[in-house]
Amino acid sequence: MDFKNYSLMLIMRKTMRLKLFLFAGMLMLGMAGLNAQQIIAHRGYWKTDGSAQNSIASLRKADSIRVFGSEVDVWLSSDGVPVVNHDAHVTLNGKELIVQDTPLATLRKVKLANGETLPTLEEYLDAFAQCDHVKLIIELKMHKAKEREDLLAKQVIDRVHQRSLQERVEYISFGIHIVQQLRKLDPQAPVYYLNGDLSPQILATMGLNGFDYHYDVLYKRPEWVKKAHELGQKVNVWTVNRPEDIQKVIDLKVDYITTDEPLLVRQTIDKQ
């Protein structure tokens, strides 16, 4: 072999090693991205100008920052219409009203902090259909009677399916009866339990996709994260806002972080 060919062979070997090194680095970065926690904006991205909790603006703003999901709370009005609000009560002209005991016409007079009218689920889903990036995480609130919870679950599932949005929507609830109804009405839907009192093994017998617990629950029972993953379940935690808690739940290897501070959570994840 002459010197010219030998030099060429050395260059080719070095080039190949460099390519392999770069490929391995890209693969590791890709795996890190796959393993990184996903962010869910709690009641939408509302800590920003022009937004408010559970407003349509908060949904659109969550979509604009490209988080995994935007969470929203749904009640049934007294006349059977799903409406969007977190608390069990709203205030109208200085008077406190119970959402589930109030007709839609009255609830529509309520204004959110950003001036929006309290939205119906129909309006929220129509706005969501125009979003490009987020999933919608719908929390169905517990009601006084199981019959009302049944009606709420059916109304929500029907409205999602009517718009062919089922691949983009997930469901959560504190109510055992509600999550069971959701599973019955839509066997393929991702359904998660919120209350923090049931083990992954019990949730598996219910056919649920995992749990969405307050972070304090997992601080006391960190083994539930590993057990859930062994059972093929996903783990979400709420509502994680402080830097120290964000880091703790990342270290616990949860799958999703629900937060009022989506940009802070993203910055923390990116630093890992």
Tell what function each PLM region has.
Residues 1-38:
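Bacterial Sec-dependent N-terminal signal peptides
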Residues 30-272:
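Phosphate-group recognition and catalysis centered on beta-loop-alpha active-site segments
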